[in-house]
């Protein structure tokens, strides 16, 4: 038995009745109180009544905190409306809404320089609520229950800039919210045009997805257009994605339905952005340098960093050691990212490097040019690992988009 309306075992039917009885105080506050809604929470916790009740009560708290009953009327800041990608394409063969998330054309740093993290996350919560509202409209239209959504993630153009920590944290928090507050609502998460960097990106958000959600991930290979129409009818897909749908003016991307993002104009940038919090702090003496070693065990990992300085600008470069177990001078190592001076005392810096070789990579903060001033540097450095299963899946699919 699948634990759905019309397909319940006697034990599941009894659990549903007991669940409803336990929630008498909560039922009037729920967006829905029918069997379909309650069974979603029971299935999410394998019909464990206590765990299901705890999950639903926490969701009600979340609804109140986020004022979800009014969120569909909430207007995101203009910069998010114009430059945060995504859109409802249409419906799959069963009538479930299909949402496209366009990753590669997004300008994560521009968005975060122009809007708050809270508004970025709230926009994604609004999308979830909007898609559930679409499910209700589809249920009324089709005369049968529609309660799941399809999400398509277009990864073409995914690059190191999309692995910027604040941007990744938005998707980590989004998937955590999806798991905790929208159980059993995702039908499929479809990945198209995934580049070689995708396993690293996936590994950053995977732990925020439940096991059942991970099972719903479908990665399409080089023939993704032919495969995508097995999930969604061509007349519900833009020509850009292998369908037949266009805008009234013939645009194959259907810009009236899907926002493709783009570079955020600097006029939207806010001047009062908070400085990031760093994990480490070091004083780099006048005429000296400081090295931070990071061991890369195998190719394909990404080295990511953030830093800011006090007391003036600071030199920064990335090097690969040629001898282990001893400190090497810059001239004795392989220069991977050329050293240059950054005005990190004015604007915090961040970056990342796709490590093509294994070895010890050195982040070098250089103050050798300053004979008068010491510099205080706050920094965070971390190694991002690819998800090996995902990497093998991409390799098995053969033709994928270039990195």
UniProtKB/Swiss-Prot annotation:
GOLD domain span: 275-383
Keyword GTP-binding on entry: no
PROSITE patterns documented for this protein: CRAL_TRIO (PS50191), GOLD (PS50866)
Single Gene Ontology MF annotation: lipid binding
Keywords, alphabetical: Lipid-binding, Transport
Stored SMART domains: CRAL_TRIO_N (SM01100), SEC14 (SM00516)
Annotated InterPro entries: CRAL-TRIO_dom (IPR001251), CRAL-TRIO_dom_sf (IPR036865), CRAL/TRIO_N_dom (IPR011074), CRAL/TRIO_N_dom_sf (IPR036273), GOLD_dom (IPR009038), GOLD_dom_sf (IPR036598), SEC14/CRAL-TRIO_domain (IPR051064)
SUPFAM superfamilies found in the cross-reference section: CRAL/TRIO domain, CRAL/TRIO N-terminal domain, Supernatant protein factor (SPF), C-terminal domain
Function: Probable hydrophobic ligand-binding protein; may play a role in the transport of hydrophobic ligands like tocopherol, squalene and phospholipids.
Protein name from the UniProt record: SEC14-like protein 4
């Amino acid at each position: 038995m699948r634990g759905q309306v019309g397909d319940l075992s006697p034990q599941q039917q009894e659990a549903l009745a007991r669940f409803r009885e336990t929630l008498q105080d909560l039922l009037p506050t729920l967006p829905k109180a029918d069997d379909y809604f309650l069974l979603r929470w029971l299935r999410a916790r394998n019909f464990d009544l206590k765990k299901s009740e705890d999950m639903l009560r926490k969701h009600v708290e979340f609804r109140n905190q986020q004022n979800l009953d009014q969120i569909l009327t909430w207007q995101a800041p203009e910069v998010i409306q114009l430059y945060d990608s995504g859109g409802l394409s249409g419906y799959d063969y069963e009538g479930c809404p299909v949402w496209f998330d366009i990753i590669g054309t997004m300008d994560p740093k521009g968005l975060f320089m122009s809007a708050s993290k809270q508004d970025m996350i709230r926009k994604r919560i609004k999308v979830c609520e909007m898609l559930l509202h679409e499910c209700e409209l589809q249920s009324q239209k089709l005369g049968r229950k529609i309660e799941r959504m399809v999400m398509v993630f277009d990864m073409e153009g995914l690059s190191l800039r999309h692995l910027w920590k604040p941007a990744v944290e938005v998707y980590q928090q989004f998937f955590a919210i999806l798991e905790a507050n929208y159980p059993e609502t995702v039908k499929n998460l479809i990945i198209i045009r995934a580049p070689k960097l995708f396993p690293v990106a996936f590994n950053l958000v995977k732990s925020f997805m439940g096991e059942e959600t991970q099972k719903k991930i479908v990665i399409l290979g080089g023939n993704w257009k032919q495969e995508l129409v097995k999930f969604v009818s061509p007349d519900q897909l833009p020509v850009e994605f292998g369908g037949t749908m266009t805008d009234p003016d013939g645009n194959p991307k259907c810009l009236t339905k899907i926002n493709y993002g783009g570079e955020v104009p600097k006029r939207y940038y806010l001047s009062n952005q908070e400085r990031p919090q760093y994990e480490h702090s070091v004083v780099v003496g006048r005429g000296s340098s400081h090295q931070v070693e990071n061991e890369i065990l195998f190719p394909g990992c990404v080295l990511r960093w953030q830093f800011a300085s006090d007391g003036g600008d600071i030199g920064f470069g990335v090097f690969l050691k040629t001898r282990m177990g001893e400190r090497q001078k810059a001239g004795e190592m392989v220069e991977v990212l050329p050293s240059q001076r950054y005005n990190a005392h004015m604007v915090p810096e961040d970056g990342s490097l796709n490590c093509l070789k294994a070895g010890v990579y050195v982040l070098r903060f250089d103050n050798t040019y300053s004979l008068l001033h010491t510099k205080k540097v706050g920094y965070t450095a971390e190694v991002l690992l690819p998800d090996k299963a995902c990497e093998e899946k991409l390799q098995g699919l053969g033709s994928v988009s270039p990195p």
